[in-house]
């Protein structure tokens, strides 16, 4: 997910997307532990998407406060 796409989302949509990605991250880690993971690069993609969403949510909160 690109940063421009994330910036277009509302605060509620950001929370939903974050929850979805955290659930996916959990499932990917579980698959890795059991040896069923096919695309190991997806773990890093999800991790970076989570960081992207958290960063933009924080920026939006700071802008609203200022």
From Swiss-Prot:
Domain of life: Bacteria
UniProt xrefs under Gene3D superfamilies: 1.10.287.310
GO cellular component, one term: cytosolic large ribosomal subunit
Keyword Lipid metabolism in record: no
Keywords from the UniProt entry: Ribonucleoprotein, Ribosomal protein
GO molecular function, one term: structural constituent of ribosome
Family assignment from sequence similarity: Belongs to the universal ribosomal protein uL29 family.
Protein known as: Large ribosomal subunit protein uL29
Organism (species): Rhizobium meliloti (strain 1021) (Ensifer meliloti)
Underlying gene: rpmC
